[in-house]
């Protein structure tokens, strides 16, 4: 079966789902050349070969190009209308990557190893968020983008927004998304509390990786958008004070405390992974 796609975002979701055949309806913006360039940028060109058809169904103008090199396509132009068929490359297994990307595989902020959610913690966080049952995911305080990237690779269907206050993290996150073949993450740079979010926006899963001393305010804003039936918030606390603030904010906003997990990695301080749910969660 061919998985149909329209637009670059949909193409990448299909690729990250490891579909063997992907049909793409192109336009004057989402051209075969643009698709090929983007695939190369995110190292997705190794998994697929590309066919391009011009004027399909027109006996006088129809032309079909079977070209194995995505790089070659990235330098070519085609007449409109056209369409693309991506096919699994020979000897390509198309296997979903293992969960838990090693921390050493990420570009860090000023080489600060504590400014990343560690791989074992990251795996637990994503499990608690139940992203397989979610559609919209927010990563607040993304820093390196590790949580968003892991989510994108494991759950390609998600619409992901990553929020980060530090301007210097923008290039780091973008570089990490390219490095780990994780396109389609909507990155928003700025203070989460000051960023505009449409009133009727609903989010299913939220990870709070950083709060800048404004944890209660962040949870209050998140609570106003959280899916009341199956929404989840996960926060990694490294102090009793932040754990206390999280519990208080959950109660103040009519949410439910779902679970707590205490874990210690190596010689690091203990971490309490806290999970809250929407007010009508069952």
Give the role of each language-model region.
Residues 144-156:
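Conserved SAM-binding loop of SAM-dependent methyltransferases across substrates and taxa
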Residues 20-112:
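A contiguous loop/helix-start segment that scaffolds small-molecule binding in enzyme catalytic cores
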Residues 159-164:
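Conserved SAM-binding motif I beta-strand of class I
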Residues 1-12:
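Single conserved hydrophobic/aromatic residue that forms the stacking wall/gate
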Residues 61-81, 242-282:
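Active-site capping/gating segments
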Residues 230-238:
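Conserved beta-strand signature within the Rossmann-like core of class I S-adenosyl-L-methionine
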Residues 165-200:
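S-adenosyl-L-methionine
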Residues 134-143:
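Conserved class I S-adenosyl-L-methionine
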């Amino acid at each position: 079966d061919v998985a149909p796609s329209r637009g670059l975002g949909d193409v990448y979701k299909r690729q990250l789902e490891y579909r063997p055949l992907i049909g793409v309806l192109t336009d004057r913006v989402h051209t075969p050349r643009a698709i090929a360039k983007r695939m190369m940028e995110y190292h997705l060109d190794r998994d697929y070969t590309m066919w391009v058809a011009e004027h399909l169904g027109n006996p006088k103008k129809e032309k079909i190009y079977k070209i194995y090199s995505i790089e070659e396509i990235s330098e070519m132009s085609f007449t409109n209308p056209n369409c693309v068929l991506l096919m699994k490359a020979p000897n390509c297994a198309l296997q979903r990557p293992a969960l838990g990307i090693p921390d050493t595989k990420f570009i860090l902020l000023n080489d600060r190893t504590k400014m990343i959610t560690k791989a074992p913690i990251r795996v637990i966080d994503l499990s608690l968020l139940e992203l397989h049952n979610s559609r919209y995911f927010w990563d607040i305080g993304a820093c390196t983008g590790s949580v968003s990237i892991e989510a994108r690779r494991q759950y390609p269907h998600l619409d992901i927004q990553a929020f980060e206050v530090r301007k210097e993290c923008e290039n780091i996150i973008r570089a990490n998304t390219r490095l780990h073949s994780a396109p389609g993450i909507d990155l928003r740079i700025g203070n989460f509390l000051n960023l505009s979010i449409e009133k009727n926006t609903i989010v299913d899963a939220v990870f709070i990786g950083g709060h800048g001393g404004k944890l209660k305010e962040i949870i209050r804003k998140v609570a106003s958008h959280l899916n009341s039936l199956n929404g989840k918030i996960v926060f990694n606390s490294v102090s009793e004070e932040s754990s206390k603030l999280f519990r208080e904010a959950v109660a103040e906003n009519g949410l439910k405390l779902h679970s707590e997990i205490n874990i210690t990695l190596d010689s690091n301080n203990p971490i309490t992974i806290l999970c809250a749910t929407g007010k009508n969660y069952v």
